Protein backbone atom coordinates (compact mmCIF):
# COMPACT_ATOMS: atom_id res chain seq x y z
CA UNK A 1 0.00 0.00 0.00
CA UNK A 2 1.36 3.37 -1.04
CA UNK A 3 0.62 5.15 2.25
CA UNK A 4 2.53 2.48 4.20
CA UNK A 5 5.46 2.56 1.79
CA UNK A 6 5.71 6.34 2.04
CA UNK A 7 5.48 6.21 5.82
CA UNK A 8 8.38 3.81 6.20
CA UNK A 9 10.47 5.63 3.62
CA UNK A 10 10.14 8.76 5.72
CA UNK A 11 10.79 6.95 9.00
CA UNK A 12 13.93 5.30 7.66
CA UNK A 13 15.44 8.64 6.67
CA UNK A 14 14.33 10.69 9.69
CA UNK A 15 17.14 11.93 11.91
CA UNK A 16 15.18 14.00 14.43
CA UNK A 17 12.00 13.69 16.46
CA UNK A 18 10.66 16.76 14.65
CA UNK A 19 11.01 14.98 11.31
CA UNK A 20 9.09 11.99 12.66
CA UNK A 21 6.40 14.25 14.10
CA UNK A 22 5.89 15.90 10.68
CA UNK A 23 5.25 12.65 8.83
CA UNK A 24 1.52 12.45 9.53
CA UNK A 25 1.00 16.02 8.35
CA UNK A 26 3.15 15.44 5.26
CA UNK A 27 1.07 12.39 4.36
CA UNK A 28 -2.19 14.17 5.22
CA UNK A 29 -3.32 11.50 7.69
CA UNK A 30 -6.71 12.56 9.06
CA UNK A 31 -6.72 13.71 12.70
CA UNK A 32 -9.38 11.12 13.58
CA UNK A 33 -6.79 8.36 13.14
CA UNK A 34 -4.14 9.97 15.31
CA UNK A 35 -3.42 9.23 18.95
CA UNK A 36 -5.18 11.82 21.11
CA UNK A 37 -2.59 13.32 23.46
CA UNK A 38 -5.38 14.32 25.85
CA UNK A 39 -6.51 10.72 26.16
CA UNK A 40 -3.00 9.25 26.03
CA UNK A 41 -0.59 11.92 27.28
CA UNK A 42 3.07 11.00 27.06
CA UNK A 43 4.29 9.04 30.08
CA UNK A 44 7.40 10.86 31.29
CA UNK A 45 8.21 8.46 34.11
CA UNK A 46 9.72 5.00 34.13
CA UNK A 47 9.29 1.99 36.40
CA UNK A 48 12.25 -0.22 37.26
CA UNK A 49 12.57 -3.83 38.35
CA UNK A 50 13.99 -2.57 41.65
CA UNK A 51 10.88 -0.47 42.29
CA UNK A 52 8.67 -3.50 41.69
CA UNK A 53 10.78 -5.55 44.13
CA UNK A 54 10.35 -2.79 46.71
CA UNK A 55 6.56 -2.93 46.26
CA UNK A 56 6.70 -6.69 46.83
CA UNK A 57 8.66 -6.19 50.04
CA UNK A 58 6.01 -3.73 51.21
CA UNK A 59 3.24 -6.21 50.41
CA UNK A 60 1.64 -4.08 47.69
CA UNK A 61 2.38 -6.73 45.03
CA UNK A 62 2.28 -10.49 45.65
CA UNK A 63 5.02 -12.93 44.68
CA UNK A 64 2.76 -13.90 41.73
CA UNK A 65 2.89 -10.29 40.43
CA UNK A 66 -0.71 -9.56 41.37
CA UNK A 67 -1.96 -6.55 43.31
CA UNK A 68 -2.43 -7.41 46.97
CA UNK A 69 -5.22 -6.23 49.27
CA UNK A 70 -4.84 -2.44 49.25
CA UNK A 71 -7.40 -1.63 51.95
CA UNK A 72 -4.79 0.24 53.97
CA UNK A 73 -3.12 2.01 51.04
CA UNK A 74 -3.11 5.76 50.48
CA UNK A 75 -6.20 7.34 48.81
CA UNK A 76 -4.55 7.77 45.38
CA UNK A 77 -3.49 4.12 45.25
CA UNK A 78 -6.98 3.01 46.27
CA UNK A 79 -8.52 5.28 43.63
CA UNK A 80 -6.34 3.88 40.83
CA UNK A 81 -6.98 0.34 42.07
CA UNK A 82 -10.72 1.05 41.96
CA UNK A 83 -10.49 2.20 38.33
CA UNK A 84 -8.64 -1.00 37.38
CA UNK A 85 -11.19 -3.07 39.28
CA UNK A 86 -14.16 -1.34 37.63
CA UNK A 87 -12.68 -1.89 34.17
CA UNK A 88 -11.87 -5.52 34.90
CA UNK A 89 -8.17 -4.80 34.43
CA UNK A 90 -6.61 -6.18 37.62
CA UNK A 91 -5.17 -9.24 35.85
CA UNK A 92 -3.70 -7.02 33.14
CA UNK A 93 -1.53 -5.37 35.79
CA UNK A 94 0.17 -8.77 36.27
CA UNK A 95 1.28 -8.80 32.62
CA UNK A 96 2.60 -5.23 32.90
CA UNK A 97 4.60 -6.13 36.01
CA UNK A 98 6.01 -9.21 34.28
CA UNK A 99 7.14 -7.00 31.40
CA UNK A 100 8.90 -4.62 33.77
CA UNK A 101 10.84 -7.32 35.63
CA UNK A 102 11.63 -9.64 32.70
CA UNK A 103 14.91 -9.87 30.84
CA UNK A 104 15.44 -9.49 27.11
CA UNK A 105 14.81 -13.15 26.27
CA UNK A 106 11.42 -14.55 27.20
CA UNK A 107 8.74 -16.98 26.06
CA UNK A 108 5.66 -14.98 27.03
CA UNK A 109 2.65 -16.23 25.08
CA UNK A 110 -0.34 -14.31 26.47
CA UNK A 111 -1.13 -10.78 27.54
CA UNK A 112 1.48 -9.65 25.03
CA UNK A 113 0.20 -6.08 24.63
CA UNK A 114 0.34 -5.37 28.36
CA UNK A 115 3.56 -7.35 28.79
CA UNK A 116 5.24 -5.22 26.13
CA UNK A 117 3.77 -2.09 27.71
CA UNK A 118 5.59 -3.10 30.89
CA UNK A 119 8.82 -3.32 28.92
CA UNK A 120 8.12 0.13 27.48
CA UNK A 121 7.67 1.54 30.99
CA UNK A 122 11.27 0.62 31.79
CA UNK A 123 12.22 3.16 29.10
CA UNK A 124 14.97 0.95 27.74
CA UNK A 125 15.88 1.99 24.16
CA UNK A 126 13.95 0.14 21.46
CA UNK A 127 11.11 -1.05 23.70
CA UNK A 128 7.93 0.25 22.02
CA UNK A 129 4.27 0.43 22.93
CA UNK A 130 2.67 -2.36 20.92
CA UNK A 131 -0.92 -2.39 19.71
CA UNK A 132 -2.93 -3.75 16.80
CA UNK A 133 -2.63 -0.58 14.72
CA UNK A 134 1.17 -0.39 14.99
CA UNK A 135 1.55 -4.07 14.13
CA UNK A 136 -0.94 -3.76 11.27
CA UNK A 137 1.14 -1.02 9.64
CA UNK A 138 4.41 -2.88 10.23
CA UNK A 139 2.96 -6.17 8.99
CA UNK A 140 1.77 -4.59 5.74
CA UNK A 141 5.23 -3.07 5.31
CA UNK A 142 6.94 -6.44 5.89
CA UNK A 143 4.53 -8.15 3.47
CA UNK A 144 6.49 -6.43 0.71
CA UNK A 145 3.61 -6.34 -1.77
CA UNK A 146 2.31 -9.87 -1.09
CA UNK A 147 -1.44 -9.31 -1.47
CA UNK A 148 -2.47 -12.31 0.63
CA UNK A 149 -0.26 -11.22 3.54
CA UNK A 150 -1.35 -7.60 3.19
CA UNK A 151 -5.02 -8.56 3.35
CA UNK A 152 -4.35 -10.68 6.45
CA UNK A 153 -2.49 -7.91 8.26
CA UNK A 154 -5.12 -5.33 7.32
CA UNK A 155 -7.65 -7.46 9.19
CA UNK A 156 -5.46 -7.80 12.29
CA UNK A 157 -7.53 -6.85 15.34
CA UNK A 158 -6.43 -9.12 18.18
CA UNK A 159 -2.82 -9.69 19.17
CA UNK A 160 -2.07 -13.27 20.22
CA UNK A 161 1.04 -15.44 20.45
CA UNK A 162 0.79 -15.84 16.66
CA UNK A 163 1.99 -12.24 16.38
CA UNK A 164 4.97 -12.73 18.72
CA UNK A 165 7.38 -13.16 15.81
CA UNK A 166 6.07 -9.95 14.22
CA UNK A 167 6.50 -8.11 17.52
CA UNK A 168 10.10 -9.32 17.77
CA UNK A 169 10.74 -8.23 14.17
CA UNK A 170 9.32 -4.78 14.90
CA UNK A 171 11.49 -4.37 17.98
CA UNK A 172 14.58 -5.43 16.02
CA UNK A 173 13.66 -2.99 13.25
CA UNK A 174 13.36 -0.16 15.79
CA UNK A 175 16.79 -0.94 17.22
CA UNK A 176 18.67 -1.45 13.96
CA UNK A 177 17.00 0.03 10.87
CA UNK A 178 16.34 3.61 11.89
CA UNK A 179 19.09 6.21 11.62
CA UNK A 180 21.58 6.38 14.47
CA UNK A 181 20.78 10.07 14.84
CA UNK A 182 17.13 9.25 15.54
CA UNK A 183 17.94 6.33 17.84
CA UNK A 184 20.16 8.61 19.92
CA UNK A 185 17.03 10.50 21.03
CA UNK A 186 15.44 9.47 24.32
CA UNK A 187 12.14 7.63 23.91
CA UNK A 188 12.38 7.76 20.09
CA UNK A 189 10.24 4.63 19.74
CA UNK A 190 7.26 6.45 21.31
CA UNK A 191 7.18 8.95 18.43
CA UNK A 192 7.55 6.18 15.83
CA UNK A 193 4.71 4.29 17.51
CA UNK A 194 2.46 7.35 17.22
CA UNK A 195 3.05 7.53 13.48
CA UNK A 196 2.41 3.83 12.89
CA UNK A 197 -0.64 3.89 15.18
CA UNK A 198 -2.30 6.48 12.95
CA UNK A 199 -1.28 4.85 9.67
CA UNK A 200 -2.31 1.39 10.86
CA UNK A 201 -5.66 2.68 12.05
CA UNK A 202 -6.29 4.46 8.75
CA UNK A 203 -5.61 1.41 6.57
CA UNK A 204 -7.86 -0.72 8.78
CA UNK A 205 -10.82 1.61 8.29
CA UNK A 206 -10.19 1.83 4.55
CA UNK A 207 -9.82 -1.92 4.06
Model features per residue range: what roles?
Residues 97-124:
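Helix-hairpin-helix
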